[in-house]
C-alpha cells in the first residue's frame, strides 16, 4: 500500500462529498486504512449511553474521510495543491507544494 502524503497537523481542503470546499487541520491520520480525520469536517452524531464517567446524550464528532477526497492547502494562496518532494542543501527531504513551490514541512 502506498504511503500517505497527509500527516497530522497538515492544513487540507476537502475535494469531494458533502463538505466539499471546506478547509481544516488533520487531527488524525490512519495510513493502514488510507483515511484522515479533519477538524470540523464530516460531522456525525453519536448517541452515547450514560456511564460513570460521561453524562451520555447526543455528541457531535468528526468521522474519517478517505485521503483521496482531500488535498493539501497551498501555504501561499490557500487553494488545493498536489505534493512533491525535494531534498534541500542541508540534506533534509521535505514536502513542497507543486502549485507554488512553497515548503510544507515545518
From Swiss-Prot:
- UniProt keywords, alphabetically: Ribonucleoprotein, Ribosomal protein, RNA-binding, rRNA-binding
- Note the InterPro entries from the entry: KOW, Rib_uL2_dom2, Ribosomal_uL24, Ribosomal_uL24_CS, Ribosomal_uL24_KOW, Translation_prot_SH3-like_sf
Q: What is any one of the record's Gene Ontology cellular component terms?
A: ribosome
Q: State the source organism's domain of life.
A: Bacteria
Cystine bridges: which residues?
Answer: none
Q: What are the recorded GO MF terms, alphabetically?
A: rRNA binding; structural constituent of ribosome
Question: Can you supply a Gene Ontology BP term from the record?
Answer: translation
CDD domains documented for this protein: KOW_RPL26
The record's section on HAMAP family has:
Ribosomal_uL24_B
Its annotated function is as follows: One of two assembly initiator proteins, it binds directly to the 5'-end of the 23S rRNA, where it nucleates assembly of the 50S subunit.
Kindly give the PANTHER family that the UniProt entry links to this protein. MITOCHONDRIAL RIBOSOMAL PROTEIN L24
Give the family from UniProt.
Answer: Belongs to the universal ribosomal protein uL24 family.
Its quaternary organisation is:
Part of the 50S ribosomal subunit.
The protein's name is Large ribosomal subunit protein uL24
Q: Which organism is it from?
A: Paramagnetospirillum magneticum (strain ATCC 700264 / AMB-1) (Magnetospirillum magneticum)
Phylogenetic placement of the source organism: Bacteria, Pseudomonadati, Pseudomonadota, Alphaproteobacteria, Rhodospirillales
Amino acid at each position: 500500500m502506498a504511503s500517505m502524503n497527509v500527516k497530522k497537523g497538515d492544513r487540507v481542503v476537502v475535494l469531494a462529498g458533502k463538505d466539499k470546499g471546506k478547509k481544516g487541520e488533520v487531527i488524525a491520520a490512519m495510513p493502514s486504512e488510507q483515511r484522515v480525520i479533519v477538524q470540523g469536517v464530516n460531522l456525525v452524531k453519536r448517541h452515547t449511553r450514560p456511564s460513570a464517567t460521561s453524562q451520555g446524550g447526543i455528541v457531535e464528532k468528526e468521522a474519517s474521510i478517505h485521503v483521496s477526497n482531500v488535498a493539501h492547502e497551498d501555504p501561499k494562496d490557500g487553494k488545493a495543491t498536489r505534493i512533491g518532494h525535494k531534498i534541500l542543501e542541508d540534506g533534509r527531504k521535505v514536502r513542497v507544494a507543486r502549485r507554488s513551490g512553497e515548503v510544507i514541512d515545518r
